[in-house]
Swiss-Prot record:
The gene is KCNN1. The keyword Transmembrane applies. This is Small conductance calcium-activated potassium channel protein 1. Changing residue 337 to Y: Increased inhibition by tetraethylammonium (TEA). It comes from Homo sapiens. The lineage of its organism: Eukaryota, Metazoa, Chordata, Craniata, Vertebrata. Residues 508-521 have a biased composition (Pro residues). Small conductance calcium-activated potassium channel that mediates the voltage-independent transmembrane transfer of potassium across the cell membrane through a constitutive interaction with calmodulin which binds the intracellular calcium allowing its opening. The current is characterized by a voltage-independent activation, an intracellular calcium concentration increase-dependent activation and a single-channel conductance of about 3 picosiemens. GO terms for molecular function: calcium-activated potassium channel activity; calmodulin binding; inward rectifier potassium channel activity; small conductance calcium-activated potassium channel activity.
Length: 543
């Protein structure tokens, strides 16, 4: 049986046809080209069917190990594509950047639909109170529009968290998305969906609302709409504004800033972005936050009090703004008070926010009025110069009065005691002023010492470190030069030690010539004069 006919799980026809694989060797005389051992469309299915062995139907009779390896690689690539896991670092970075952009767009769309739902809710509430009723078709249409925007918002929130889970998988190299679904993440997603799902549903639903009036303490019963309880929590959707600010912040999107923050163990979140904005433009942030909170709280108080305020004091928008303003500033005149627990709760939160904003305003104003470090240095320098001049003037006054006292007591024939007492008085005043200025100058020196903050100390330490590093480098260079000089001195010393021997050898007289010895004849002398000369003759001639 051919190894490509059955794989244990998928049955194929073994007859001739498009789906059949060749089981016999191809006939070269049939006029048809030889078929491949298996079709490309069945590679993934056949890859792990049986161990690789030579195929008898192969036109060349080669084993199928190479084809099986290629099938395994294709299976692995298919599994990577199916799991969404990139194949290398470049693909992972590109996929991560694309997920970042998709998450940013989803956050923008979620904020747009969330704000759209709030605007339509406020419009429907105001129109249903003064223009038409809750039973009208216009109210039903606006509520349907709110429900549609809420459904789209919920879908966008789900997609946003799906992108976040994909980013978690890419960053941590996870293969299963359920790894990222911790209990905390599930709770936060559920809470966010619950907050975004609150909205006034289409229809007219009422309930009995009982309250006690503020000054008369008389009970007040009214038939209120359920939309009041479902409309006010819609302002919780404004948390999406902080998410959009974070995702669009240059600090969050800049790779260099994120790298530096990671090295310094800084988490880039909404809190960090708000701190940065409070450092850059604190006045603008406080102004926008205060005005927004003021308007939202005033409208909420108006909606809460409209069913029990028969005199239209707090149910009027201007009256509600006055109540919120005096509560925000912690004044509390008492001319206007809320009747319902809803209005009292809003006023309580307004008072807490007002206390916090007041503290922030005081801190911001104090920081703005404080001199900078450069201004402090300039101010201290100018004060020191003025004090130095005043001390010099006081010393000159002391010398002048001393001379005048001496002049009017010793250099005149008849001293004028009144003038002498006058100059003595000025003399004592000059001495006292000089002593006082010296003490003031000492205090000024203490202020200068206090002006050296931790930043100045850190800067001084950095400068000292640079100086020490430079001195260390110069010291190493000097040591290298000294080592080179020492080696040269050693060589020069060795040369000087060998110099006497060379001089003695140069001035030594040559030895006297030796007397000739009688003996050999001319042939022996010729042989002795060239004993090492070689000629291509018999060896006996050299011996």
């Amino acid at each position: 049986m051919n190894s490509h006919s059955y794989n244990g799980s998928v049955g194929r026809p073994l007859g001739s046809g498009p789906g059949a694989l060749g089981r016999d060797p191809p006939d070269p005389e049939a006029g048809h080209p030889p078929q491949p051992p298996h079709s490309p469309g069945l590679q993934v299915v056949v890859a792990k069917s049986e161990p690789a062995r030579p195929s008898p139907g192969s036109p060349r009779g080669q084993p199928q190990d190479q084809d099986d390896d290629e099938d395994d690689e294709e299976d692995e690539a298919g599994r990577q594509r199916a799991s969404g896991k990139p194949s290398n670092v470049g693909h992972r970075l590109g996929h991560r950047r694309a997920l970042f952009e998709k998450r940013k767009r989803l956050s923008d769309y979620a904020l747009i639909f969330g704000m759209f739902g709030i605007v339509v809710m406020v419009t429907e509430t105001e129109l249903s109170w003064g223009v038409y009723t809750k039973e009208s078709l216009y109210s039903f249409a606006l509520k349907c529009l709110i429900s549609l925007s809420t459904a789209i918002l919920l879908g966008l929130v789900v997609l946003y968290h799906a992108r976040e889970i994909q980013l978690f998988m890419v960053d941590n190299g996870a293969d299963d998305w359920r790894i990222a679904m911790t209990c905390e993440r599930v709770f936060l997603i559920s809470l966010e969906l619950a907050v975004c799902a609150i909205h006034p549903v289409p229809g007219h639903y009422r309930f009995t609302w009982t309250a006690r009036l503020a000054f008369t303490y008389a009970p007040s019963v009214a038939e209120a709409d359920v939309d009041v309880l479902l409309s006010i929590p819609m302002f919780l959707r404004l948390y999406l504004l902080g998410r959009v600010m974070l995702l669009h912040s240059k600090i969050f999107t800049d790779a260099s800033s994120r790298s530096i923050g990671a090295l310094n163990k800084i988490t880039f979140n909404t809190r960090f972005v708000m701190k940065t904005l409070m450092t850059i433009c604190p006045g603008t942030v406080l102004l926008v936050f205060s005005i927004s909170s003021w308007i939202i709280a005033a409208w909420t108080v108006r909606v809460c009090e409209r069913y029990h305020d028969k005199q239209e004091v707090t149910s009027n928008f201007l009256g509600a703004m006055w109540l919120i303003s005096i509560t925000f500033l912690s004044i509390g005149y008492g001319d206007m008070v809320p009747h319902t627990y809803c209005g009292k709760g809003v006023c309580l939160l307004t008072g807490i926010m007002g206390a916090g904003c007041t503290a922030l305003v005081v801190a911001v104003v104090a920081r703005k009025l404080e001199l900078t470090k450069a201004e402090k240095h300039v101010h201290n320098f100018m004060m020191d110069t003025q004090l130095t001049k005043r001390v010099k003037n006081a010393a000159a006054n002391v010398l002048r009065e001393t001379w005048l006292i001496y002049k009017h007591t010793r250099l005149v024939k008849k001293p004028d005691q009144a003038r002498v007492r006058k100059h003595q008085r000025k003399f004592l005043q000059a001495i006292h002023q000089a002593q006082k200025l010296r003490s003031v100058k000492i205090e000024q020196g203490k202020l200068n010492d206090q002006a050296n903050t931790l930043t100045d100390l850190a800067k001084t330490q950095t400068v000292m470190y640079d100086l020490v590093s430079e001195l260390h480098a110069q010291h190493e260079e000097l040591e290298a030069r000294l080592a080179t000089l020492e080696s040269r001195l050693d060589a020069l010393g060795a040369s000087l030690q060998a110099l006497p021997g060379l001089i003695a050898q140069a001035i030594r007289p040559p030895p006297p010539p030796l007397p000739p010895r009688p003996g050999p004849g001319p042939q022996d002398q010729a042989a002795r004069s060239s004993p090492c000369r070689w000629t291509p003759v018999a060896p006996s001639d050299c011996g």
